[in-house]
């Protein structure tokens, strides 16, 4: 009872009908963490390991050799020991030592010859495009009304079921498998944008921050009149946004602007929650990845083994979504008002129209948000480097170091374990060294730069004669994968929370959509350039030079980001957008 009274005392008054200003509860935080535990396995275990292999193998089982365009690819693969040679291609061994790994296979799609490896890449490209469309279209509904949680749960259920459906897809229906992959990856990306949009709200309503504002004698929602005075104001006059971070210039106690060297309490809390979420997701991914490796090995490493693993990944995602669905509060945003009275049949059309018009308007106005532009440009290059280094390293290990699939699986496990360690340890390091969030990100970039530089050492004649160092031996991939995972753990948590500090308050979903689109869209370019370099020189090692440049480019951009200026600009833009945010929706569109 005493805790309830304390909670009631620090709860700020609502700013619009349906506003949930209850302090963030421990159960709500557990619900937020549980979705990271549920869904992170998809991006690590499925997208990072088994989904591309499954798509390529299913297409291969239905394809023909490129050499003669008549011999089925499945005929060139040996069945595992103890199986009948009359079994279908669905039980073909994937990594038999007798299999001609260099033989290229093609499938015919709409009359075009498509390489089976390209089929997986095209599938992911389509999913990224569809994902971007969905993320933009739903951002209006996520920012307004009570749809944020509904959309999150819907995307989670559709994505997890689509992943589980691989268990029923036969190799001759590989296009259907590609469709399931598009749906699953699209829903995963959309759900994580929605999950990220909850983070500033959880921080803003956290009891420790509400208590701090109360002790300071200020409203947690900014400098607002008391509720008794606001009761007679019209809804249009109420500022419905509650900033994640205060402006930092002054407060009711006349405190001076926070020191540049100090990290705000809000950002510390946001970083802590974000880091915990990333770490919990990585722990889940490590556990399930090990389970998946055991399943594949003990089921003779067939195409069915991979489909079974994808079913397990989808089942994990599905089951652990329910705690989030039960415990995560909707936290509705201010409703959109319709000029014609708000007919329900027009509401979703209005939300979609609002989202696209808002995106265009916001994209035009972000030119005034210098620090968000600098950060997004840096993140565009950095996320491209992250995705490209991962794929390039695996391809390098397979083609030039002749590492077996089991060894490649261990590389992924080591990277994930290092990611867990990094997600939890970077906050400690930054606290001990008194680093701001931007400085921690810069430290991660510098450490990340060591990965391609180490690969370039193999060009130095003196080192080349040693026979090791510079990625000349398979064992060198393991410590390098630890460095990669350590960097990913820091970048994943700090970039997300740091970007949240620069977002205009009240527009979290829309700006996190830009964050996600920047993240996903950038990964098209790096792999293509690495492929061109590999075709030009006949080996992958020269591509490490390109990767070194790609990772280094974000560094000067990140150094230019000024968080205090960014917060002031975000507050100003939020005030400007507030005038258009209350425009009524007429005939499903915004005027």
Swiss-Prot record:
Main subcellular location of this protein, as a coarse class: membrane
Q: Where is carbohydrate linked to this protein? A: 239, 300
Q: Which UniProt keywords apply?
A: Amino-acid transport, Autophagy, Glycoprotein, Membrane, Transmembrane, Transmembrane helix, Transport, Vacuole
The record, for InterPro entries, names: Atg22, Atg22-like, ATG22/LtaA_families, MFS_trans_sf
Q: Name one Pfam family in it.
A: ATG22
Instruction: Offer a single GO CC term for the protein.
Output: vacuolar membrane
> Which segments show compositional bias classed as Polar residues?
239-259
| Membrane topology of this protein | Multi-pass membrane protein
For whether the record's keyword set contains Glycoprotein, the answer is yes
Cysteines joined through disulfide linkages: none
Stretch list, region Disordered = 1-23, 214-259
* Location within or outside the cell: Vacuole membrane
User: GO biological process: what's one of them?
Assistant: amino acid transmembrane export from vacuole
UniProt cross-references to Gene3D superfamilies, sorted A to Z: MFS general substrate transporter like domains
- Provide the leader sequence positions: none
Q: Where are the transmembrane segments?
A: 35-55, 116-136, 149-169, 175-195, 277-297, 308-328, 372-392, 406-426, 441-461, 478-500, 512-534, 543-563
Family membership: Belongs to the ATG22 family.
Main function: Vacuolar effluxer which mediate the efflux of amino acids resulting from autophagic degradation. The release of autophagic amino acids allows the maintenance of protein synthesis and viability during nitrogen starvation.
* PANTHER family associated with the record: AUTOPHAGY-RELATED PROTEIN 22
Q: Per its record, how is this protein called by name? A: Autophagy-related protein 22-2
What species does this protein belong to? Aspergillus terreus (strain NIH 2624 / FGSC A1156)
> What's the gene?
atg22-2
């Amino acid at each position: 009872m005493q805790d309830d009274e304390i909670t009631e005392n620090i709860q700020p008054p609502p700013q619009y009908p349906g506003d949930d200003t209850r302090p963030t509860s421990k159960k709500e935080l557990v619900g937020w963490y549980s979705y990271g535990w549920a869904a992170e396995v998809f991006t690590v275990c499925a997208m990072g390991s088994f989904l591309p292999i499954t798509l390529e193998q299913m297409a291969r089982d239905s394809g023909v050799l490129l050499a003669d365009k008549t011999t089925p690819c499945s005929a060139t693969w040996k069945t595992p020991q103890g199986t009948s040679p009359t079994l279908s291609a669905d039980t073909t061994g994937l990594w038999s030592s007798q299999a001609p790994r260099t033989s290229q296979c093609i499938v015919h799609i709409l009359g075009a010859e498509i390489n089976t490896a390209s089929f997986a890449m095209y599938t992911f490209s389509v999913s990224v495009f569809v994902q971007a469309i969905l993320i933009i279209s739903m951002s209006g509904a996520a920012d307004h009304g009570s749809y944020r949680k509904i959309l999150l749960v819907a995307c989670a259920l559709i994505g997890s079921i689509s992943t589980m459906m691989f268990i029923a897809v036969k190799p001759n229906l590989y296009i259907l498998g590609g469709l399931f992959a598009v749906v699953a990856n699209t829903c995963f990306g959309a759900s994580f944008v929605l999950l990220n949009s909850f983070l500033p709200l959880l921080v803003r309503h956290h009891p420790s921050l509400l208590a701090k504002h109360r002790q300071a004698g200020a409203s947690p929602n900014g400098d607002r009149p008391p509720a008794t005075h606001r009761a007679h104001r019209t809804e249009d006059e109420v500022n419905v946004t509650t900033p994640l971070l205060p402006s930092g210039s002054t407060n009711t106690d006349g405190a001076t602007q926070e020191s540049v060297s100090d990290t705000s309490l809000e950002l510390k809390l946001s970083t802590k929650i974000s880091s915990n979420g990333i770490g919990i997701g990585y722990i889940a991914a490590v556990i399930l990845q090990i389970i998946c490796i055991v399943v594949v090995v003990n089921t003779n490493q067939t195409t069915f083994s991979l489909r079974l693993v994808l079913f397990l990944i989808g089942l994990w995602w599905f089951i652990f979504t329910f705690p989030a669905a039960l415990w995560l509060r909707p936290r509705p945003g201010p409703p959109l008002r319709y000029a014609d009275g708000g007919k329900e049949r027009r509401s979703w059309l209005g939300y979609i129209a609002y989202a696209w018009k808002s995106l265009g308007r916001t994209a035009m106005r972000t030119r005034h948000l210098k620090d968000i532009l600098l950060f997004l440009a840096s993140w565009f290059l950095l996320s491209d480097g992250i995705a490209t280094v991962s794929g390039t390293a695996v391809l390098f290990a397979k083609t030039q170091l002749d590492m077996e699939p089991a060894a490649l699986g261990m590389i992924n496990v080591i990277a994930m374990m290092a990611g867990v360690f990094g997600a939890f340890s970077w906050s400690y390091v930054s606290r001990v060294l008194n680093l701001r969030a931007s400085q921690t990100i810069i430290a991660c970039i510098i450490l990340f730069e060591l990965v391609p530089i180490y690969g370039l050492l193999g060009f130095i004649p003196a080192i080349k004669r040693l026979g090791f160092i510079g990625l000349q031996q398979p064992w060198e991939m393991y410590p390098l994968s630890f460095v990669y995972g350590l960097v990913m753990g820091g970048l994943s948590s700090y970039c997300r929370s740091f970007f949240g500090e620069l977002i205009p308050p009240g527009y979290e979903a829309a700006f996190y959509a830009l964050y996600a689109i920047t993240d996903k869209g950038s990964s098209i370019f790096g792999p293509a350039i690495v492929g061109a370099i590999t075709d030009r020189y006949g080996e992958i090692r020269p591509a490490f030079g390109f990767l070194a440049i790609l990772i280094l480019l974000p560094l000067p951009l990140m150094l230019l980001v000024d968080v205090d200026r960014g917060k002031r600009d975000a507050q100003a833009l939020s005030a400007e957008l507030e005038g258009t945010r209350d425009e009524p929706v007429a005939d499903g569109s915004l005027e």
